Amino acid sequence: MTPTYPLQRLFASLTLIAAFVWPLQRAHAEGQVKIVDQYGIGSLLLKVAKDQKLIEKAGARAGLDIDVQWNTLSGGAAVNEALLSGAGDIATIGIGPLMTIWDRTRGRQDFRAIAAQSAVPVYLVTNDPRIRSIKDIGEKDRIAVVSVAVSQQGRLLQMASAQAYGDANYARLDRFEVNMPHADATTAMLSGNSVINLHFSNAPYQYQELEDPKIHKVTSSTEILGGPSTGSVVVTSEKWRKDNPKTYAAVRAALDDAARLVEKDKAQAAAIYIRQDGSKLSPAFVERILNDKDTSFATTPQNTLQLGAFLHKVGVIRHEPKSWRDYFFADDKNAQGS
């Protein structure tokens, strides 16, 4: 049976409260946008846009005064609920949750990605020396993820399980997963005295965990997907995009501006991340992550189709994506994504 935690109950309550803090209108005048972000370096482009007011600046260049409202949630399931309820217009989610919301809203709200944000590898880490591969995980083990099965990490774990045990057993490890925000999971892992002995993490938390010599990496998104891949995207609905073309264009331009800033000045980007996430990490530590050879921040997606094809093959989504353009808005006809 999956254990429960006071922090989980508190988080669930806060998620529900957050969904009602903002007005639930689905349509409004140009110049207003409600954005839901998540914690972590994966959504650095939105954090840079917020910190530097890049959306407002892009709007001003087009003669539009934009009021941006921000909220932060944890996990793709909570964020998808915020989008579907109208509590958010635009949000950060992983490729797994993107496939889910794209599949389920086709022909209705038609949620798709505006742009990629980052290709930052995510690691499955453990503090148990016994566990060296997926096949070593058993009944006594518990894996912390932000949303059981449906998060980006949950979907990657399903893909790894299918690779190890066959497609019919893709959900074999789901029953060992526990809902827990990354920060709490990191604390549990570092304590060494929690029921949690694995964490499918993200940046910067996985790097903090690996600073402890008792913690090691079991696998990663890079290994599961066979190379670097976009893990975080920015999404909205076709309806919101059509109803707010100028605001949408400002958001899209701001993401490109943010990507250029990150590419040009990693030190400034690290400082922005620390400021926006309220992180206690040192600027040098964060900058080292941003300079990792396997990490990149670009608005064109990389190696995303493979996960979508897998989710269709095992029956998680009904519609098979044939191209990355199926679940991304076609704003740049010349973009060479994958």
Where are these regions (language model features)?
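Sec/Tat signal peptide C-region and signal peptidase I cleavage site
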Residues: W22-A29
